[in-house]
Amino acid sequence: GDCAAVQYSGAGGRDPLFLAEHFIPFLNDHIKPLLVGRDVDAFLPNARFFDKLRIDGNLLHTAVRYGLSQALLDATALATGRLKTEVVCDEWQLPRVAESIPLFGQSGDDRYIAVDKMILKGIDVLPHALINNVEEKLGFKGEKLREYVRWLSDRILSKRTSARYYPTLHIDVYGTIGLIFDMDPLRCAQYIASLEKEAQGLPLYIEGPVDAGNKPDQIRLLTAITKELTRLGSGVKIVADEWCNTYQDIVDFTDAASCHMVQIKTPD
């Protein structure tokens, strides 16, 4: 299993930085004895055991739990002669749907050339774009992002190889919209709604419009933005990321109707 953490460890309410050399002795001392000789005929009981296990009063780091769950799932699949997908579907009593799921392509700072590559490859959702700086990427009035969304939709509509290619635009703004509008959810929503026409009919998702610095305020602000978008009749969708990491976080954000989508990173 890959004991991997998310890119921004320690930020937005996440577990602290995970360094393998610090945790290998811990795994050898505390986890290895629990794995040797363990029954792996079923995955779910083992996954739940390690997910709730506490050592010295602390839950295992999310990266450790992620790696362990991968290894345990693989072990169950090998032991029972099934694909890992089949194990998950069987144990959660889910249907086996033989269809592809949309893939999200991420450009990083290469937000122009990478988009051309994504268009040619027919990526379902694009481009992330890494809008994490007001001056260079968003603009103090949001003008740079507005121009980018228009360029993005123009590029897709002019360079796509099939009229059936109709991707979703998903842009992560790292809380920068909140910065230029003084964390006012109504002004944030009005700006976000104004981007819809620049997308020229392509579905538009804005991830992390604000970063409130804590979970309760993040839920409050995202809820207000989402409600205002609905009132304005906007089709732009809000994606929660920061402060929405664990299963319980996801429950809390969605119960508050604070967003249209949650950005779930598998190690979280």
Regions found by a protein language model. Name each.
Residues 66, 113, 252:
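Short, flexible, glycine/charge-rich loop motifs used to bind or transfer phosphoryl groups or to couple energy/partner
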Residues 59, 63, 67, 71, ...:
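Conserved active-site and cofactor/substrate-binding residues in soluble primary-metabolism enzymes
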Residues 31, 35, 39, 68, ...:
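Structural signal for hydrophobic packing residues in well-ordered secondary-structure cores
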Residues 1, 31, 69-73, 81-84, ...:
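Long, contiguous hydrophobic alpha-helical segments, chiefly transmembrane helices and signal peptides
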Residues 13-27, 139-155, 183-195, 217-227:
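Well-ordered, non-membrane alpha-helical segments in soluble/globular domains
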Residues 2-82:
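Metal- or metallocofactor-binding catalytic centers and their adjacent structured scaffolds
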Residues 158-268:
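Catalytic core of soluble alpha/beta enzymes
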Residues 74-78, 82-153:
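Glycine-rich, mobile lid/loop segments that gate access to catalytic sites or pores
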